[in-house]
Every structure is written in structure tokens, then in C-alpha cells.
Amino acid sequence: RRQRQMCIRDSPIPPFTTSTLQQEASRKLGFSAYKTMRVAQKLYEGINLNKETSGLITYMRTDGVQISQEAITNIREFISNEYGKNFIPESPRYYKSKAANAQEAHEAIRPTNFTYSPKLISKYLDKDQLKLYDLIWKRTLSSQMASAELDKTTVDIKSKDNSITFRTNGSQIAFPGFLKVYKESFDEKTTSSDNDDDKLLPILNLNESLDLKKLEDEQHFTQPPARYTDASLVKKMEELGIGRPSTYASTLRVLVERDYVIKESGKLIPEERGRILTAFLSNFFGKYVDYEFTATLEKDLDKISDGKLPYKDLLSDFWRDFKKHLDKMTDLE
């Protein structure tokens, strides 16, 4: 028995910023943040296409989600020609960053020429370049496509003798829209839940006969928070206002290179050296490793960049307090 509960519209997400590119490349491609930026740098600087060097993507250090009007026009035209007019919304989509400290000085990361599809230029790219370019190309394309229409559905499956009923909740695609091209990945859930409404279900007919292939009995428990990955740590840094698009990858790289953390199966695990350093800084320099202090300092640096705050004032205020902490350290044995 299939029961349709409601039809919902699922809208596409914005094109990539530096942080979202690093997160999605980590989830979908298994790239570290550093590797993502290294490959993106090459795509930005230019690839030799038939004896002509062309930059394939826009600047890859950005917190902006907006793209130029010319690019939007070209993308909408491409979608209409490739998928049909019902796959483009009536009006172009415009996005604005939700990050508190976003400067949006640059466009989102997008292909510079949408006629250069991944398939068309695949022979000019190495394996990693093609994977990342394909990710950027599809994400940008999907950001200007029509919303997907999903039927929230409950399906009951009964045994032949009607003694057992299995129930599952999920969605069935009524109209794919942007899902025709791209679906976002997510970090692993930190808790178990019976709520599987996000699951995509196949189209089933009333009284359709199904074959049981496998039956598993599972017991779920509440799980502790998952360890950070490159993707989830970059996301957390952005939420806390720590760092900039230009520093996310290098920050994570330093943690590994200095043996503060190690990577196991993509998870970042603190090493003894990292734990000792954290304990020392928290005890003696707690103010300076506080998330709020770092976020506030980032905002002050923005004010200096905009000419709203003299840099000497910031340095003077910082050093006056910091020196007091340093002087206290000289008394430690």
C-alpha cells in the first residue's frame, strides 16, 4: 500500500564558495582541503586546450555565492537547450551568503566557459582535475535549474499471509528538476534515527508483488559526536567565523604536518602533542584560543582592510594585554 502524504519543492543550493567546495570535494571525491585547492589552482591558472591555455574556473578563494549576470544568462540558455525549458525557473536565481563574516569580494567558483563541458575537455585534464571540474560544473549548472518536486510517501509492505507489515517513509521524485544534474552530500549523522524521510523510494504500484532478498535485524543506539573530517571541520570553522577562504586548507595542513592530529579513514584524530598543546594554551592563553576572540579579530582585520580601523590601534591594544601574559610565563619553572 502506497500513501502519498504531500508534494514538496526542493530548491537547488548556491554555487561553490571555497569552504563548500572543500567540503563537497572531501565527501564526494575523498580530497583533502589542501589537495582540493591545489587542483583548483591549476584549473584557475589555465589548462592547455588544443594549443591554447584557458583558465577553466573563476578565482577559487572566495566566500561569495553570487555569479555574474552574463554567466547566469549563458547557464540558463545551456539548460534550456540541453534539458528543455521546463528545467529552468521563470526568473534567474540569485544567492546571498549566510556566513556572518562573508566579504563576497569575488564571484562564486564557477566554470568560465559553460560550453566547456567535462565530457568535451576530458582529454585535456588529468584524473583529479576532471573530477573537480565536473563537480564545479554540475554544481553551478544545478544552481540555476528548476526546483525538484518530491512526493512524501509512506509505503506499507505486507507478507503474503498478512501476518507482518513493514513500513518505510521517504520521497518519490515527481519532477527531477536540478536533481537531474546534482545532489548535495552530507556529513555522517551523529545520532541514529528512525526518521528516514530523506530516503528516495522507487515507484511502486498498489498490490505489486515484491521479492524479499535480504532481511536484517538492527538495533540503534545514540552515538557520540562523529570525529571531524576535513569537510566538517571547514564547515565548523566557517560557522564560528574562524579563518578565511585563503586559510582553511593551510590550517588543516599544519595540524597534520606538525603531528597535532593524524588522519585515519578520513577522520582527524588528536595526537598526544596536540592534546598537550591544547591543554597548555587553554590554561595559560585561554583568551587567545577562544572562538569569540578569533572571530572578533577577523572582523577587526576586515575593518583595517576597509580603512575603518588604524592597524596600529589594533596592534597596540593586542600587545598591551598579550605582553602581560608573556611576563607571567617567565615565572613558570
Residue ranges and their predicted role:
Residues 9-14, 23-32, 57-67:
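Conserved short loop/turn motifs at secondary-structure junctions
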Residues 3-8:
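Short, small-residue-biased leader/transition segments that mark boundaries at the very start
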Residues 33, 55, 63-333:
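Basic, low-complexity terminal or inter-domain segments flanking catalytic cores
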